[in-house]
Regions:
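Conserved AdoMet
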Residues: 33-106
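Conserved Class I SAM-dependent methyltransferase catalytic core
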Residues: 215-271
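Conserved SAM/SAH cofactor-binding pocket of Class I
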Residues: 96-195
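Mobile active-site "lid"/loop adjacent to the S-adenosyl-L-methionine
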Residues: 189-220
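A general structural signal for well-ordered alpha-helical segments in protein cores
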Residues: 8, 28, 57, 70, ...
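A short N-terminal interaction module
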Residues: 1-57
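Residue-level signal for inorganic ion chemistry
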Residues: 31, 67, 97, 126, ...
């Protein structure tokens, strides 16, 4: 084995105390590729020296063993073919949210020139996807830090997005447009009683305000969005599978479609 293979083995062994063997092997490989800017197969046949980056690797390893997500450690994540900046305090975009983006595009709800808005935008992931598809996009979040991250991502891709700081629950808030072609939101929807089922790195590092809702009113964001945007042509949401019944009742006056994610869980709601 050369230095890179030995180092990968060492990293995977250390990470094995927290991750499964498969995850540890994958993360070890990613760390080496990130540190040296080359695919792992090229590193294996190179004559490079690991000690050039060993302090960086040790620092990343320490953070990972401290339950910090890989995306925060590296400072970026992949989303719908984009490489997005992320940092602690902003929800990490999930594959489930990528699937929501592909659903709205494949069903023709997202098209060039469509007036659209992303509510609870976080890192700006959904808004960026919509803008790349040619839509006219607004994006709203209450968190100044989230908006600063979204702004960096927007600037990186040179897209036009009307980014706004706003509290949807402010009595004085009102939409800029009376009828959007498409309203999309991945709002907080995790019940507090679900905490025990969640990974420590999520609970310890990702923003609670972007995750949790009260157990006694889990659909408050959806209710408020309906109050504000029900005139819009299409509403598309990521949802909690536990709330399907309540959401069906909420949108009793519209056509609703519930869609399962790649894990077979009811994860999306399309209102037309």
């Amino acid at each position: 084995m050369n230095e890179f293979q030995t180092t990968k083995q060492w990293l995977a062994t250390e990470l094995g105390s927290y991750y499964s063997q498969e995850e540890a092997e994958y993360i070890a490989r990613i760390l080496l590729e990130e540190a040296f800017g080359q695919p792992y197969p090229m590193l294996v046949v190179s004559d490079g020296k690991v000690n050039q980056k060993i302090d960086l690797l040790k620092g990343w390893l320490s953070r990972l063993l401290g339950h910090e997500p890989l995306q925060y450690v590296l400072g970026h994540t992949s989303f719908c073919g984009m490489d997005l900046y992320v940092s602690s305090g902003v929800l990490i975009p999930r594959p489930e949210t990528e699937e929501l983006c592909y659903i709205i595009r494949s069903r023709g709800h997202l098209f060039p020139g469509a007036t659209s808005i992303d509510l609870c935008t976080g890192s700006g992931a959904i808004a960026l996807f919509m803008a790349k598809c040619g839509a006219k996009v607004e994006a709203i979040d209450i968190s100044p830090h989230a908006l600063s991250v979204a702004e960096k991502n927007i600037h990186r891709y040179g897209l036009e997005i009307d980014l706004q700081r706003a509290d949807l629950f402010d009595a004085h808030f009102s939409p800029k447009c009376q009828q959007y072609d498409l309203v999309v939101s991945n709002p907080p929807y995790v019940l507090n009683k679900e905490r025990m089922e969640m990974e420590p790195h999520v609970l310890e590092t990702e923003p609670e305000m972007a995750l949790f809702v009260p157990d006694d009113d889990p659909i408050l964001f959806y209710r408020r969005i309906k109050e504000l945007y029900n005139n819009s042509k299409v509403l598309a949401f990521e949802i909690n599978p536990l709330c399907v019944g309540e959401l069906r009742e909420l949108f009793y006056d519209r056509k609703v479609e519930f869609i399962e994610d790649f894990n077979g869980k009811t994860r999306y709601l399309i209102v037309t």
